[in-house]
Protein backbone atom coordinates (compact mmCIF):
# COMPACT_ATOMS: atom_id res chain seq x y z
CA UNK A 1 0.00 0.00 0.00
CA UNK A 2 2.84 2.42 0.66
CA UNK A 3 3.97 2.29 -2.98
CA UNK A 4 0.49 3.23 -4.16
CA UNK A 5 0.61 6.38 -2.03
CA UNK A 6 3.86 7.50 -3.73
CA UNK A 7 2.59 7.07 -7.29
CA UNK A 8 1.47 10.07 -9.33
CA UNK A 9 -1.86 8.93 -10.81
CA UNK A 10 -2.38 9.13 -14.56
CA UNK A 11 -5.06 11.81 -14.16
CA UNK A 12 -2.33 14.21 -12.96
CA UNK A 13 0.16 13.37 -15.72
CA UNK A 14 0.98 14.65 -19.17
CA UNK A 15 0.77 11.72 -21.59
CA UNK A 16 0.45 11.20 -25.33
CA UNK A 17 -1.63 8.65 -27.19
CA UNK A 18 0.01 6.17 -29.52
CA UNK A 19 -1.74 7.67 -32.56
CA UNK A 20 -0.12 11.14 -32.32
CA UNK A 21 2.72 12.18 -34.62
CA UNK A 22 6.26 12.95 -33.56
CA UNK A 23 5.53 16.61 -34.30
CA UNK A 24 2.52 16.59 -31.97
CA UNK A 25 4.45 14.75 -29.26
CA UNK A 26 7.31 17.26 -29.48
CA UNK A 27 4.84 20.11 -28.96
CA UNK A 28 3.44 18.36 -25.87
CA UNK A 29 6.95 17.83 -24.51
CA UNK A 30 8.05 21.40 -25.18
CA UNK A 31 4.85 22.89 -23.73
CA UNK A 32 5.06 20.74 -20.61
CA UNK A 33 8.79 21.15 -20.03
CA UNK A 34 9.24 17.40 -19.44
CA UNK A 35 12.05 15.46 -21.07
CA UNK A 36 9.84 12.42 -21.58
CA UNK A 37 6.21 11.38 -21.12
CA UNK A 38 4.35 8.07 -21.18
CA UNK A 39 2.76 6.83 -24.40
CA UNK A 40 -0.65 5.23 -23.84
CA UNK A 41 -2.90 3.32 -26.21
CA UNK A 42 -5.92 5.06 -27.76
CA UNK A 43 -8.10 4.17 -24.75
CA UNK A 44 -5.62 5.67 -22.29
CA UNK A 45 -5.45 2.36 -20.40
CA UNK A 46 -2.43 0.50 -21.75
CA UNK A 47 1.15 1.68 -21.27
CA UNK A 48 3.07 1.41 -24.54
CA UNK A 49 6.36 3.04 -23.50
CA UNK A 50 7.96 6.48 -23.20
CA UNK A 51 8.80 9.18 -25.71
CA UNK A 52 11.88 11.31 -25.06
CA UNK A 53 12.34 14.86 -26.31
CA UNK A 54 16.01 14.12 -27.03
CA UNK A 55 15.14 11.28 -29.42
CA UNK A 56 12.66 13.43 -31.33
CA UNK A 57 15.21 16.26 -31.63
CA UNK A 58 17.83 13.81 -32.91
CA UNK A 59 15.36 12.36 -35.42
CA UNK A 60 14.38 15.86 -36.60
CA UNK A 61 18.01 17.05 -36.90
CA UNK A 62 18.74 14.10 -39.19
CA UNK A 63 15.89 15.11 -41.50
CA UNK A 64 13.49 12.49 -40.17
CA UNK A 65 9.79 12.54 -40.97
CA UNK A 66 7.97 14.32 -38.15
CA UNK A 67 4.63 12.90 -39.32
CA UNK A 68 5.62 9.39 -38.25
CA UNK A 69 3.66 7.98 -35.30
CA UNK A 70 5.15 8.59 -31.87
CA UNK A 71 5.56 4.83 -31.50
CA UNK A 72 8.35 4.91 -34.09
CA UNK A 73 10.66 6.32 -31.37
CA UNK A 74 9.04 4.55 -28.42
CA UNK A 75 11.41 3.53 -25.59
CA UNK A 76 11.13 1.62 -22.30
CA UNK A 77 8.14 -0.52 -23.35
CA UNK A 78 9.12 -3.21 -20.85
CA UNK A 79 9.99 -0.84 -18.01
CA UNK A 80 7.05 -0.98 -15.63
CA UNK A 81 6.13 -2.34 -12.22
CA UNK A 82 2.96 -3.50 -10.53
CA UNK A 83 1.30 -1.19 -8.04
CA UNK A 84 1.79 -4.05 -5.57
CA UNK A 85 5.53 -4.50 -6.28
CA UNK A 86 7.98 -4.81 -3.43
CA UNK A 87 10.28 -1.83 -2.86
CA UNK A 88 13.29 -4.05 -3.52
CA UNK A 89 12.09 -4.61 -7.11
CA UNK A 90 11.31 -0.92 -7.55
CA UNK A 91 14.85 0.18 -6.71
CA UNK A 92 16.40 -2.02 -9.39
CA UNK A 93 13.75 -1.16 -11.98
CA UNK A 94 13.89 2.63 -11.66
CA UNK A 95 17.63 3.23 -11.34
CA UNK A 96 18.28 4.19 -15.00
CA UNK A 97 14.97 5.92 -15.70
CA UNK A 98 13.48 9.35 -14.93
CA UNK A 99 10.40 7.49 -13.70
CA UNK A 100 8.86 4.06 -13.96
CA UNK A 101 5.36 3.29 -15.17
CA UNK A 102 3.06 1.65 -12.64
CA UNK A 103 0.32 -0.78 -13.67
CA UNK A 104 -2.71 -1.76 -11.62
CA UNK A 105 -3.93 -5.29 -10.86
CA UNK A 106 -5.50 -5.53 -14.34
CA UNK A 107 -2.29 -4.33 -16.05
CA UNK A 108 -3.88 -0.98 -16.88
CA UNK A 109 -1.72 2.14 -16.62
CA UNK A 110 -2.08 3.53 -13.10
CA UNK A 111 0.57 6.27 -13.01
CA UNK A 112 4.29 6.82 -12.51
CA UNK A 113 6.78 6.59 -9.69
CA UNK A 114 9.57 9.17 -9.78
CA UNK A 115 12.88 9.29 -7.93
Show where each model-derived region lies.
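Short, flexible segments with low predicted structural confidence
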Residues: 1, 28, 44-45, 61-66, ...
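The conserved cystathionine-beta-synthase
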Residues: 15-34, 39-41, 79-98, 102-106
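Bateman (tandem CBS) regulatory domains
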Residues: 1-13, 66-78
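Short beta->alpha transition motifs characteristic of CBS
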Residues: 34, 38, 46-62, 95-101, ...
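Alpha-helix boundary recognition
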Residues: 7-8, 30, 61, 74, ...
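Short beta-to-alpha loop/turn elements within the nucleotide-binding domains of ABC transporters
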Residues: 20, 51, 68, 85, ...
Amino acid sequence: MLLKSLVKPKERLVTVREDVTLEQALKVLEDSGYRCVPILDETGQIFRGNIYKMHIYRHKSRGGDMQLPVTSLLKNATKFISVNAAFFNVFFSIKDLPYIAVLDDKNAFYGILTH
